[in-house]
């Protein structure tokens, strides 16, 4: 039996949940979306229901989300200015990260 990789998504917009979320959800034999983090509660609730994520794994606060590692992999599909900060936090927790481009709009962060 093959391992099912667990996935978390930060940023439930057109890329995070509409593109990546849909891709992972359609391949249930390989992936399971286990947690979501999104500032907009309406999007968070909608995709939580659509992807069957338990209520206790839906976050509007990134600090609460990053209190512990929640999955094998993390998709970071937030605003560009937030990418570096979130990616560093994710790597500290040991996530495999799929980071939307660009890494940062600020050359000083490279």
Q: Where are each of the predicted segments found?
A:
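N-terminal Rossmann-like dinucleotide-binding module
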Residues: 1-52
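Beta-loop-alpha module in the N-terminal Rossmann-like domain of NAD(P)-dependent dehydrogenases
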Residues: 53-110
């Amino acid at each position: 039996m093959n391992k099912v990789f667990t996935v978390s998504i930060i940023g439930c917009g057109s890329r995070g949940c509409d593109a990546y979320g849909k891709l992972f959800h359609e391949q249930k034999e390989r992936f399971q979306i286990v947690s979501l983090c999104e500032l907009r509660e309406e999007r968070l609730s909608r995709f939580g229901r659509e992807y069957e994520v338990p209520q206790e794994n839906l976050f509007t606060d990134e600090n609460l989300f990053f209190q512990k590692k929640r999955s094998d992999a993390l998709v970071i599909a937030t605003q560009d200015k937030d990418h570096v900060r979130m990616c560093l936090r994710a790597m500290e927790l040991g996530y495999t990260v799929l980071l939307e481009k660009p890494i940062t709009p600020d050359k000083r962060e490279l």
